[in-house]
Amino acid sequence: MSRIDATLSALKSEKKTALIPYITAGDPHPDMTVNLMHSLVEQGADMIELGVPFSDPMADGPVIQKAVERALEHNVSLKNVLAYVTEFRKKDAQTPVILMGYLNPIEAMGSDVFAKAAAEAGVDAVLTVDMPPEESEGYFQDLSLAQLDRIFLVSPTTPDGRLNAVSEKGSGFVYYVSLKGVTGSKALDVDDVAQHVGHLREKMSMPVAIGFGIRDGNTAYEMAKLGDAIIVGSALVSLIEQNASEDSAVIQQVLSDKMREFRQAIDKADNE
């Protein structure tokens, strides 16, 4: 059983929803990334989604695009990101780490080389934004051979044919994009999300993680009633941006306060 499967299975047995924060590797400074990862776990993260900086992050909104720019100013590469995970694993062998990024840096390394290196570093899963499940059998086979879970994005407009492919090729969980548009979009329609998540559960047996548009405790509370996991990104990354010139302790504190808000809201929903 993979670390992701074990984590979600344990939480399900306790009737709890997973909290998965996202940060961009190397933002605001490469020296801070590993400490921020540990801090997120201390504040209730069940898994961590780590963004791999890439110069054309087409699915990301302005908040995460700026985070990517800050990381790229420090020349943070895919190899650096794997090194951060290796460092993180020296103190944390339990918390699953999911890499989220684009195909270009992986292709530059070679997908087979990347898959082996990622597994050796302690990565658990890869979400490749611009690689749909119908394409590149070889790439997904490389990930599978390295025992890396394959995470896919699905949205309210994803056709059933694509959902079937996600069910076949994906593992770990499916990432449901609860809003049309890019990351960091605003208004969530709870009834609409409930309807689409219900349809997802009819089409596949994988756990459902809900992301995009979860900005505060209220939205986390509503989404925790619907998903197996909640992913929060832009709300945290915007705090990093606002405090980018501060030292690591200040950034950890503001993230801790926001994480506590999310964790308490999710726990409240789980206990009702």
UniProtKB/Swiss-Prot annotation:
Gene Ontology terms for molecular function: tryptophan synthase activity
GO (cellular component) term, any one: cytosol
Keyword DNA-binding: no
Gene3D superfamilies given in the database record: Aldolase class I
Regions crossing the membrane: none
Catalysed reactions, semicolon-separated: (1S,2R)-1-C-(indol-3-yl)glycerol 3-phosphate + L-serine = D-glyceraldehyde 3-phosphate + L-tryptophan + H2O
Keywords tagged on the record: Amino-acid biosynthesis, Aromatic amino acid biosynthesis, Lyase, Tryptophan biosynthesis
Record bears the keyword Lyase: yes
Residues at the active site: 49, 60
InterPro entries for the chain: Aldolase_TIM, RibuloseP-bd_barrel, Trp_synthase_alpha_AS, Trp_synthase_suA
Pathway(s): Amino-acid biosynthesis; L-tryptophan biosynthesis; L-tryptophan from chorismate: step 5/5
Disulfide bonds: none
Annotated EC: 4.2.1.20
UniProt function note: The alpha subunit is responsible for the aldol cleavage of indoleglycerol phosphate to indole and glyceraldehyde 3-phosphate.
Subunit structure: Tetramer of two alpha and two beta chains.
Similarity section: Belongs to the TrpA family.
HAMAP family registered for this protein in UniProt: Trp_synth_alpha (MF_00131)
Protein's name according to its UniProt entry: Tryptophan synthase alpha chain
Species of origin: Hydrogenovibrio crunogenus (strain DSM 25203 / XCL-2)
Name of the gene encoding the protein in the UniProt record: trpA
